[in-house]
From Swiss-Prot:
It comes from Drosophila melanogaster. Residues 671-692, 700-712 have a biased composition (Basic residues). GO terms for cellular component: nucleolus. The modification Phosphoserine is found at S236. Belongs to the SDA1 family. This is Protein SDA1 homolog. Residues 560-572 have a biased composition (Basic and acidic residues).
Amino acid sequence: MVRPNNNQLPENLPQLQNLIKRDPESYSDEFHIQYQHFLSLLEVFALNPSEENKSLDDIVMFVAQVAQCYPAVCEEFPKRLSDLLKNYATVLDPAMRNCFVKALILLRNKNLVPALDILELFFQLLRCPDKNLRTFLQTHIVTDIKNMNAKHKDMKLNSSLQAFMYSMLKDANPKAAKMSADIMIELYKKNIWNDSKTVNVIATVGCFSKVTKVLVTSLKFFLGHDEEDEEEDTDSENEVDLKGALMANRVNKKTKKRTKQLAQIKKQAVKAQKKKKNAPAFNFSGIHLVHNPQGMAEGLFKQLQATNERFEVKLMHLDVISRLIGIHDLFLFGFYPYITRFLQPHQRQVTRVLQFAAQASHELVPGDIIEPILKTIANNFITERNSSDVMAIGLNATREICMRCPLAMGEDLLQDLAMYKTYKEKSVMMAARSLITLYREQLPALLHKKDRGRQTEAQAERKVRAYGEREVHDTVLGAEALLKDSKTIDIESEDDTDSNDGEWVNVAHSDGEGGGADDDEEDEDEDEDDDDEDEDEENSNDEENEDEDNSDEGVESGEESAKAKKEKKDMRILNQKEAAQELALTRIFTDEDFKRINAANLKKTVTSARKRPLEQDRAEFVKLNSIEMIYKKRKHDKESRLETVQAGRQDRERFGWKDGRVNEHCSKTNREKRKTKNFGMLRHKARSKVKKSFKDKQQALRKHLLHQKKMK
């Protein structure tokens, strides 16, 4: 029997493909034959596109593989495939459709097809009822756009694609719209389309889509915290245990497989170490980039009131609206009465509803708007007919709301809630005390006098702000702590530098500095100096013949006093607050300076304030506060714990095996020596023990027992 020849080029396309890639010119005729064959098969296939054609499948992939060798001949090849997909996208056989898509991707990877044309076609193919194809296209679209923006962002292409995406989100096909939203969100998370245009397309179209899946996907994008938590969990689970792998490799038997596994674990450990050292890349939250947050919040609230979606979708609406209100300080007064309806202990997901109420609170919301929420929580949660957990949740929610809007709390309600500080259940008691602590810092006047506590310096410095008032700092808080070491600013009272009440410092200036008031004072000083000099001259003329030595000494002392007065004119007396402002303007703070500033600010929070202000001159007495300063006991860190452990080991015997010999320099027994011997020295004896017969073992045991008996 004659074997068939498998190397015939017209029928063996893989062999012809290999030869063409090596030498395109020599096999151009064969390629032309195959291309004409492709055109004829394509015309036949167009008559019945729903039928699979294996010959066309093979020849399409063949032409796509070698198209770069004959660009002039294959110029119309991508267009023919694109037209076929556009005209018969939903009718084509799934296998043939996948074949054409893969061929176009192959041509796109070789830069034989414009990116915009091919991506627009692929977005249209998302309407096809083929899940595998849609997933494949999504992966390719994201990868292709990522590669195009790898070196620098192609703004023109991105703008065109985003405009096309805008229309795709409005598509009537829910699957295409959902896939388009997924692609945009994935590109945003990969920092490719992380601009405001992408965010606002999702905000204006996705969040108001009639398709529930698109709506939920868009709302999750603006919430977007669960996925980050999941990534952190997976990272912690997949952490490489290099130390354990090294120990296992040392103990276990050495094999090639285990050696390869150890090398792979080492590579993973090095990679993880580099990843930890690299600066983390943060995704800027999309909710900050919304152009019209007020309009978006109002639209979502209107949609929420009219929707009949599941309760989970309503919770997403509430979450996004509350975040918009809290982040952008919006006014949406109808939101608060709406959310009050859900504030019942038996309400499903009531803790999340309380969270949304706190998120929607900010300082610019009038207290009269939020006060009904606090009263509802107090009436429904903070009552003794409920369990202690419900009461504690209500108090905690009240604290979170008041933390963002302190003026919403009334004096009577606050004092009633403060009475739970002595409640029998610890959870309720601690929650009430946390609320008291909050108002000790914010508005202590609302508390009962016995609940206000001893005022600290930080509380004394804090000004009670009215509605809508902003706290503006004109210097770095705590910069007074750096005045003592300042070279340009001289503190007159070096004995007491802990407080900023009435302390005065001298600030050195150059000759050209100073205001008009200082110039007037300098002029007056100069006039007085001139008068003094005239009087000195007259006196010196009268007494010139009497004592020449005294006149010389007077001239010298006059020169010294003039220098001292000139230096004094260059000094300007400031209080400590003004000196801190001067220091912030004339000095660049280092990390050590900021550490000292933070320590000084922390010190103010634990230092009791004075009942009356200190006097201006502070050199006459020592501050009582500097003696009675109380610091919180800090938790021991690892270094301090190790120091304590080492100190306890100094006068203690070491744990472990003890040498029972009276003289440590005398010889050891054979049994003790055997423990430290190399196994090679004991191998022969161990082998002889294994080979012993039962009778030999009996004799050896009898001999050993007799020897032990004699030793007694």
